[in-house]
Swiss-Prot record:
Renumbered residue ranges of the record's region Triple-helical region: 1-222
Disulfide-bond pairs as recorded: 243-332, 276-329, 288-294, 351-449, 385-446, 397-404
Pfam families per record: C4, Collagen
Keywords, comma-separated and alphabetical: Basement membrane, Cell adhesion, Collagen, Disulfide bond, Extracellular matrix, Hydroxylation, Repeat, Secreted
Protein's recorded name: Collagen alpha-4(IV) chain
Pro residues compositional bias, start-end: 26-44, 60-72, 95-122, 206-215
Compositionally biased residues, Basic and acidic residues: 174-183
Protein family per UniProt: Belongs to the type IV collagen family.
GO biological process, one term: cell adhesion
PROSITE patterns in alphabetical order: NC1_IV
Compartments, as annotated in UniProt: Secreted, Extracellular space, Extracellular matrix, Basement membrane
Organism: Bos taurus
Sequence segments annotated as region (Disordered): 1-218
Tissue specificity note: Alpha 3 and alpha 4 type IV collagens are colocalized and present only in basement membranes of kidney, eye, cochlea, lung and brain.
Length: 453
């Protein structure tokens, strides 16, 4: 605002000195006055004045109301091609088409190989004589000698010549034997000869009728004995087999088929007493070396045992679980050697005359285990005639783990039936047998026999 009105003159105190004092200091500015009333608008400015600076931007206005919908747009361009769809399912076969028109003739084939040489034709007729040669035009030069002709056929034997005089030389060696002459006429019978020496003794005559029964002998010193032949029985169950009547039992055990050590197999004939071990073990052997050291259960050695008819397990067996799966056996003393006979058909083969039957079965031939190792049975051995057939007749025991199982790489081989009229025919037809009944019909039957004592 404008400066206020000047203040009233101050009154100086009357001093002791009658003269007036010095003028006082200027007072402080007064407070601001109230705001004045705005003045009237001034006259319009001259055009000659400078243009002012642009004002500040105004505050943004409120949003406007939505406008009306616009007109429809133009038609768009065609879109891009889509991705290839998946292949559809195969269609049904169409009907057979009409026969095609005959094709054009093929190209001429290659010439065939030359044919065989034909037989020699008959000699031709003699040709006409040629014209006489011009002796003056052709000088007579002798030609070369011709090629020797083929050897002619052998001539007939000439008549024997006259005996010539002896030659001047020394007497030669005797000549070769002449041809055999014709047989002469039989001579007249000669006089009877002298009596010959005594001939050799003739064959023994037929046995005579049995003589009368002798007197009873004295009482013996001890019990009787058999001949010492051994007979091995395998029950293919977990029960011990019974020896035939009159054959004492020597021992019982478990049916050992074969052993495998150092990746090599050692077979046991089921008809011999060594296949009946008194005590079972998944690893019944140790191996020793030249350094005087023996090792047991240090390698992946195995043992294979004849199995019982128990159902196949799903997992490996251990400890007491193994017992019902191992076949039991017995060794008996027999009066004679037992043999197996095989029919190679479905019929039971008969025992030879004066022999009696011990059991009938199926012809077990051979077996393989881990890798290409295995063994087999001699077809005359009673071990080749098992009383019961099954596709997996034995199980493998892994000695180090102490477990037994029917592994998939174990194979058994059996003698098959053969029809006599087809034994020399064409190749056998392949076949796969899955049913137990069909398998048994394909396997040869057998019988174990022993001679009557």
């Amino acid at each position: 605002g404008p400066p206020g009105p000047p203040g009233a003159p101050g009154k100086a105190l009357k001093g002791d000195i009658p003269d007036p004092g010095l003028p006082g200091d200027q007072g402080p500015p007064g407070p601001d006055g109230p705001r004045g009333v705005p003045g009237p608008p001034g006259p319009p400015g001259s055009v000659d004045l400078l243009k002012g600076e642009p004002g500040d931007c105004g505050l943004p206005g409120p949003p406007g109301l939505p406008g009306p919908p616009g007109p429809p747009g133009h038609k768009g361009f065609p879109g891009c091609d889509g991705k290839h769809g998946q292949k559809g399912p195969m269609g049904f076969p169409g009907p057979q088409g009409p026969p095609g028109s005959p094709g054009p003739p093929g190209d001429k084939g290659l010439p065939g190989p030359p044919g065989r040489r034909g037989p020699l034709g008959p000699p031709g007729s003699r040709g006409e004589p040629g014209p006489p040669a011009d002796l003056d035009a052709c000088p007579r030069i002798p030609g070369l000698p011709g090629v020797p002709g083929p050897r002619g056929p052998e001539g007939t034997m000439g008549l024997p010549g006259m005996r010539g005089p002896p030659g001047p030389g020394c007497k030669g060696e005797p000549g070769l034997d002449g041809r055999r002459g014709e047989d002469g006429l039989p001579g007249s019978p000669g006089p009877p000869g002298h009596k010959g020496d005594m001939g050799e003794a003739g064959c023994p005559g037929a046995p005579g009728p049995p003589g009368p029964m002798g007197d009873p002998g004295p009482i013996g010193f001890g019990p009787g004995y058999l001949s010492g032949f051994l007979l091995v029985l395998h029950s293919q169950t977990d029960g011990e087999p019974t020896c035939p009547m009159g054959m004492p039992r020597l021992w019982t055990g478990y049916s050992l088929l074969y052993l495998e050590g150092q990746e090599r197999a050692h077979n046991q004939d089921l008809g011999l007493a060594g296949s009946c071990l008194p005590i079972f073990s998944t690893l019944p052997f140790a191996y020793c070396n030249i350094h005087q050291v023996c090792h047991y259960a240090r390698r992946n050695d195995r043992s294979y045992w004849l199995a019982s008819t128990a159902p196949l397990p799903m997992t490996p067996l251990s400890e007491d679980e193994i017992r019902p799966y191992i076949s039991r056996c017995a060794v008996c003393e027999a009066p004679a050697q037992a043999v197996a006979v095989h029919s190679q058909d479905q019929s039971i083969p008969p025992c030879p005359r004066a022999w009696r039957s011990l059991w009938i079965g199926y012809s077990f031939l051979m077996h393989t285990g881990a890798g290409d190792q295995g063994g087999g049975q001699a077809l005359m051995s009673p071990g080749s005639c098992l009383e019961d057939f099954r596709a997996a007749p034995f199980l493998e025991c892994q000695g180090r783990q102490g477990t037994c199982h029917f592994f998939a790489n174990k194979y058994s081989f059996w003698l098959t039936t053969v029809r006599p009229d087809l034994q020399f025919s064409s190749a056998p037809l392949p076949d796969t047998l899955k049913e137990s009944h069909a398998q048994r019909q394909k396997i040869s039957r057998c019988q174990v026999c022993v001679k009557h004592s």
